[in-house]
Amino acid sequence: MPDKPVGRHGSVLQASPVKQYALSKGLPVLQPEKLKDEAFLSELRALKADLQIVVAFRMLPEVVWDMPRLGTFNLHASLLPQYRGAAPINWAVINGDTETGATTFFLTHEIDTGKIIRQKHLPIADTDDVGIVHDGLMTMGAG
């Protein structure tokens, strides 16, 4: 995913914290515009990864998530199977849920349906908004 424009007029590109960390550790960072681009796929294959990790990303083509021998897992901001797909935090707050969480699971053909590896729970207070729940999940997911 390309760096995001920030600032008053969006004229400055800022690397994500994940990219900054990877670069500080000398890890390769791939940022394709198209996930089916053959140059990107060749570069990804050349890494010979045993495992891939995806966080908060769009649907990956099977050729990408099926590449590592151990598979690819994802961190999703809900207690799957509840709130599969987009905006799970928003739906938990809109629906007045008292609890949400994060699920780590292996990617498969259908969105957010793979084998669950782990789930962590996070209470939602009556006064919590989407931003508070988001921040709580991000802190929990990073730990």
Model regions and ranges:
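One-carbon transfer enzymes
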Residues: 1-143
